Amino acid sequence: MSASGFQKAFEGYLYENNTDGSGKASSYLKSIEWLHAMLDIESYGFSDCKDVWSINDVSRLSALRKRVLEEKRKQSESPWVHPNIPVSYLRDGYCTSALADLIEFIPEFEHVQRVMEAHAQHTNSSELAEKLNFEPTIPDGYVHDPQSKDGQNRICEAKIRIGQAAFRKMILSNYQNRCCITGLDITTLNRASHIIGWSDPKGKKIRMDPSNGLCLSATYDAAFDQHLISVDPDNRLLISKEIQNHYSNESVTNYFKNREGQAI
């Protein structure tokens, strides 16, 4: 993938995960632009990183992040504190945080690409599930001390997060980014729900099976997770007795009761 394509993919990742509306995504993207300018002033041996988007080596980016932290600690003594560069991007940690997110993004991006390539080549669900029954690769440099307990925990958490991100991408693609109950197509509001849960031992072999997933908008995903709704073997919506017997207001009727038996 080209550097511009990689940049666009990272932008999408940031905005997709910027759910609190804080403006973090745009600040991180801007901080990388200013980091390029800082490296133009003094590269410290990182001249290859003057275009960060051309670097997909996690170890190299981790080394760059370490240098940024060192310059941050120097405060006004750093040559990167320059009249033409807003000081807040270095001083307040935006550059280091942006690089941390980029380091997290790279193995997820690479794993999702592998999953989607396999998804495009296989139409048989069980065959695809077997093909995708592999763990994400966590590259060197992703954690500071991979042999420590904390490092091992971070790697384990990363593998789960990356696997779920790939599953989400595949399920939303299968459903054309539309909630299978309402047709809602606002991607940031839709979830990839596991029919058999990710942590359920019975579902270990089918975690990545496309037939084990539904695209549901947030309300229905929460209801599904709480067993308030389910699906029968013919993929028709079932409403729990708890909803049927204990809730009677108009919203519940419209959202749930009137959809009983709907094919999804």
Segments (PLM) and residue ranges:
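Non-catalytic DNA-binding core/recognition domains of DNA-processing enzymes
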Residues: 16-108
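Calponin-homology-like cytoskeleton-binding modules
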Residues: 8-18
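Ser/Thr/Pro-rich, acidic low-complexity intrinsically disordered regulatory segments
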Residues: 1-8
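A boundary/linker detector
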Residues: 90-165, 184-189, 254-264
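C-type cytochrome heme c attachment motif
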Residues: 177-181
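A detector for short metal-coordination/catalytic motifs
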Residues: 156, 162, 166, 174, ...
